């Protein structure tokens, strides 16, 4: 579903542009019609590899942290504010990131949630570090774009959207900071449609904004999710589910707000197109979620809905064919190299997106650029700054090769 070659942009002469804007993979291996074993195919289908992108200060890293909280990867969410007593975030672990409260380098975070294995890449929002974000967008199958509800589409948002569009990366939108004074939600989705050129498909709808923001209405389930705030949003928000006509909902909202919400929900059914997963994956429609990452409102709703719709690993275009992720030939490409991830050891990590097949520790691969055979002895799975030796990985996964590997960004390994 959604893996047609029509979603792939044409390759350009520049290898750097190819890395940013296409699914180009210069494989020269012999064609293989063999596929991975059934158990490995199931593992590949479980993968959801995506990036979170935004204009600076839209709440991207906060949303990342809350997805980890609801995904069970952490028990207590950190904060990106400068208060010393608050816990630091899992994704912003570098000294500069902790000091400035911003992301300056992309971070890989893998965790399991229900039936999915999630590979989440938190990216820098500030334009000074945007090159790192562009490289990451060559390694993902979808992207979550975070919008500030008080500001709407901002310059860096539009710039990153264009990169995703050229690469055929499906976009999911999270309109954040509904707990603050916000622009009218109908105005926001109208702007998104006009500026981005994609059909909006609101998955949920906000119940008020600012201090009056109480939760969201799940349009698919026809349920209202009412939340209670927790200190600093460090824990999961207590949730109460009810029908929109339930007396609990009427009591939680003012008469005026309740009437506004019911009218807007009815209007949406008449003016927006039904959510169509095929159109989402084809880059024609964008699911839209409302919430507050800081207070955990709407985060779980977004996470579960997103994982249902987001694509599993998609193929990449080689010089002669589409590379199927389920082929038994291992292939991958280098999309990022970062030095001094561990200052005590002055190491160098080479980030590889696995495109097809299975990675096994100590396997030998060929660097297609140099023709050299290389043994991958020290591969690691990363969770922010934490590392774990990796014995096996599958198409869709991101691995870090640590050591003196003589690879360059854009290298293909087979």
For each of these PLM feature ranges, what is it?
Residues 1-13:
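N-terminal chloroplast transit peptides
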Residues 11, 21-414:
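Structural and coupling elements of P-loop NTPases
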């Amino acid at each position: 579903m959604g893996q047609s070659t029509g979603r792939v942009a044409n390759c350009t002469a520049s290898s750097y542009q190819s890395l940013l804007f296409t699914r180009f993979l210069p494989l020269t291996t012999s064609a293989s019609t063999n596929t991975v074993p059934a158990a490995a195919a199931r593992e590949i289908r479980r993968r959801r590899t995506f990036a979170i992108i935004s204009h600076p200060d839209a709440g991207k890293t906060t949303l990342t942290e809350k997805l980890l909280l609801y995904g069970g990867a952490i028990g207590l969410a950190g904060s990106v504010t400068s208060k010393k007593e608050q816990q630091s975030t899992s994704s912003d672990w570098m000294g500069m990131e902790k000091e400035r409260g911003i992301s300056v380098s992309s971070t890989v975070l893998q965790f399991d949630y229900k039936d999915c294995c999630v590979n989440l890449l938190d990216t820098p929002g500030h334009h000074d570090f945007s090159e790192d974000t562009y490289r990451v967008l060559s390694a993902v199958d979808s992207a979550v774009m975070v919008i500030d509800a008080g500001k709407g589409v901002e310059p860096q948002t539009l710039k990153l959207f264009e990169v995703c569009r050229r690469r055929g990366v499906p976009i999911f939108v999270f309109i954040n900071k509904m707990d603050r004074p916000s622009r009218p939600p109908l105005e926001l989705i109208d702007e998104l449609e006009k500026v981005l050129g994609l059909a909006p498909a609101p998955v949920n709808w906000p119940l008020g904004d600012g201090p009056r923001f109480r939760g969201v209405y799940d349009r698919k389930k026809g349920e209202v999710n009412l939340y209670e705030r927790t200190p600093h949003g460090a824990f999961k928000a207590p949730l109460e589910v009810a029908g929109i006509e339930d007396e609990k909902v009427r009591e939680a909202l003012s008469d005026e707000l309740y009437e506004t919400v019911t009218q807007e929900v009815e209007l949406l059914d008449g003016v927006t197109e039904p959510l169509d997963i095929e159109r989402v994956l084809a880059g024609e429609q964008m699911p839209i979620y409302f919430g507050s990452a800081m207070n955990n409102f709407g985060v779980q709703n977004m996470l579960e809905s997103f994982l249902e719709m987001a694509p599993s690993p998609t193929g990449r275009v080689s010089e002669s064919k589409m590379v199927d992720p389920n082929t038994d030939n291992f292939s991958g490409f280098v999309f990022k190299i970062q030095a001094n991830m561990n200052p005590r050891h002055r190491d160098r990590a080479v980030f590889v997106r696995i495109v097809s097949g299975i990675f096994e520790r100590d396997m030998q691969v060929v660097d297609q650029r140099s023709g050299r055979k290389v043994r991958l002895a020290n591969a690691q799975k990363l969770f922010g700054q934490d590392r774990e030796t990796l014995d096996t990985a599958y198409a869709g996964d991101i691995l870090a090769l640590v050591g003196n590997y003589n690879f360059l960004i854009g290298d293909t390994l087979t």
